[in-house]
Amino acid sequence: DEQADLSVHGGLSKAVYAYPLEHYGFWRTVRAQARAGGWEDDLLPPGAMGEILTLDGLNERHLWIGDQLRFADGGVLVVSEPRFPCFKFNAAMGFSKAAKLMVESGYCGAYLAVLEPGQVQAGDNFTLHPGPRELEVLALFRARTSGKKF
């Protein structure tokens, strides 16, 4: 996998992008309102947000920097930071206000670093092991996007 701009994409702390499944309904709605195309029947399948890992039941309000996701068959990921949208997100979503809506909604997802390598497949279960619980992903996202234009 190659990344074009390593200042905002890739690197060890951004090895895995995880996005909450529950936010897909929001994006389907706003894409329909914007008359954005690109996906048949506007289904937005898992992975459409650019994530490698789609999380069910875990979002930015439940994830804290340093939390660990431990998978049953091996592999440990640690939450490192929220995703910050760039101009390419607008193009990927098919309308010009997508990045702005990500900032306003806080539906950003999170980057994860690999703490212990392992194999993870669709449907695998994991357990959340709390980190120090000092900084919530959404709080960090809000702090870093406050006052910036998208």
Predicted regions mapped to residue ranges:
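Short beta-strand-turn/beta-hairpin segments enriched in glycine/proline and small hydrophobics
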Residues: 92-104
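Short, electropositive, low-hydrophobicity segments enriched in small/polar residues
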Residues: 70, 113, 122
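Loop/turn positions that initiate beta-strands
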Residues: 66, 117, 121-124
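Short alpha-helix capping/helix-loop boundary micro-motifs
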Residues: 55-57, 106-116
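A structural signal for small-residue-enriched, beta-sheet-centric alpha/beta enzyme cores
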Residues: 107-108, 124-126
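Electropositive, beta-rich accessory/interaction domains or terminal extensions
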Residues: 1-89, 97, 130-150
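Compact, aliphatic and Gly/Pro-tolerant "microcore" segments centered on a short helix or tight beta-hairpin
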Residues: 76, 97-98, 110-113, 119
